[in-house]
Amino acid sequence: MTTRLGPALVLGVALCLGCGQPLPQVPERPFSVLWNVPSAHCKSRFGVHLPLNALGIIANRGQHFHGQNMTIFYKNQLGLYPYFGPKGTAHNGGIPQALPLDRHLALAAYQIHHSLRPGFAGPAVLDWEEWCPLWAGNWGRRRAYQAASWAWAQQVFPDLDPQEQLYKAYTGFEQAARALMEDTLRVAQALRPHGLWGFYHYPACGNGWHSMASNYTGRCHAATLARNTQLHWLWAASSALFPSIYLPPRLPPAHHQAFVRHRLEEAFRVALVGHLPVLAYVRLTHRRSGRFLSQDDLVQTIGVSAALGAAGVVLWGDLSLSSSEEECWHLHDYLVDTLGPYGINVTRAAMACSHQRCHGHGRCARRDPGQMEAFLHLWPDGSLGDWKSFSCHCYWGWAGPTCQEPRLGPKEAV
């Protein structure tokens, strides 16, 4: 179906969404599209205005990467994250056991206090990808953290035999990694309690594409599922989940929906620990080729996210998208012609379904997640569907099949 909308409808939807305003309501609105692209240079350097507000896309003032509607902290931007550089150089001790945690938390608190207003209520994403907090998750190039932990144990416990030293390395790493991640989230939430705090790419799924796999199902790897269950403490400490649904470069389009669906279903599974909103990260361009996502790619990422009941998506891109006037115009045209109209269609359909089926107190989600043709889309003439394939996931404070009953106490769903 076509999703192109007229200018009047675009403006009307933008006004009803309250675009560009602070967002304490993100967990309690049917679907949000957020902008995490450093596109400020398009306007300030090249005079190219990107009409994000008019397209219903939530962005920071001035379209800056960090701001009061959403922010992301990379490894060198919050506290003293320990990691090894490309040449093996240890930063902040290299491993969690070697980090002075109190110094890290003090610096993180200072940075949060000075970068986010007290009323901050948007997504706040920590992008720490160098190591996994579980020992078994550090394979491939991450084995360096196991080796460094063993060397640490040999130095700290020289009188133990090698097997006991290995045990100290394993337990010491996991305990320190947990303390680092948990305590960072606790400090952040104490300072900015309305923010949606969580780690990018968590939970993982392990359903990446391998070209030799002829029977690809999209299901998450069993070992990854087991590790996610072990990470119950991380979900309990988070206030939102930010899984990645970046499309793998060589994944055939026929498998896109299965890839995205299973990643989101795993996020919904672990989200039950704290009834957390799920905001999926979508990359605007294909890795390697740099091509913008096609209309069908948007359906299989943004559209599937909305249909499964995600709270929204975070659109991500790098500085190359605003590196020249030409690149800014390419981004502008893509926004106006493709991304913006589709985002408006899905956002408005999700809002209408919420009011039609859930009394405006919940979001619609597929009854059967595998029903691949069920989407929250408007018809080409802008009319609404009946959405019989969808049921309600109620917001905090509401219950019942159509979220019609006020409810006090713990969150029923988000």
UniProtKB/Swiss-Prot annotation:
InterPro entries: Aldolase_TIM, Glycoside_hydrolase_SF, Hyaluronidase, Hyaluronidase-3
GO molecular function, one term: hyalurononglucosaminidase activity
EC number: 3.2.1.35
Alphabetical keyword list: Cell membrane, Cytoplasmic vesicle, Disulfide bond, EGF-like domain, Endoplasmic reticulum, Endosome, Fertilization, Glycoprotein, Glycosidase, Hydrolase, Membrane, Secreted, Signal
Highest taxon above the source species: Eukaryota
Catalytic reaction annotation: Random hydrolysis of (1->4)-linkages between N-acetyl-beta-D-glucosamine and D-glucuronate residues in hyaluronate
Signal peptide, first to last residue: 1-20
GO cellular component, one term: sperm midpiece
Active site: 129
Positions of the EGF-like domain: 349-404
Disulfide-bond pairs as recorded: 42-328, 205-220, 353-364, 358-392, 394-403
Coiled-coil boundaries: none
Subcellular location: Secreted; Cell membrane; Cytoplasmic vesicle, Secretory vesicle, Acrosome; Endoplasmic reticulum
GO biological process: carbohydrate metabolic process; hyaluronan catabolic process; negative regulation of ovarian follicle development; ovarian follicle atresia; penetration of zona pellucida; positive regulation of acrosomal vesicle exocytosis
Post-translational modification: N-glycosylated.
First-listed, main subcellular location of the protein, grouped into a coarse class: secreted
Glycosylation sites: 69, 215
Function: Facilitates sperm penetration into the layer of cumulus cells surrounding the egg by digesting hyaluronic acid. Involved in induction of the acrosome reaction in the sperm. Involved in follicular atresia, the breakdown of immature ovarian follicles that are not selected to ovulate. Induces ovarian granulosa cell apoptosis, possibly via apoptotic signaling pathway involving CASP8 and CASP3 activation, and poly(ADP-ribose) polymerase (PARP) cleavage. Has no hyaluronidase activity in embryonic fibroblasts in vitro. Has no hyaluronidase activity in granulosa cells in vitro.
Family membership noted in the UniProt record: Belongs to the glycosyl hydrolase 56 family.
Name of the protein in question: Hyaluronidase-3
Encoding gene (name): HYAL3
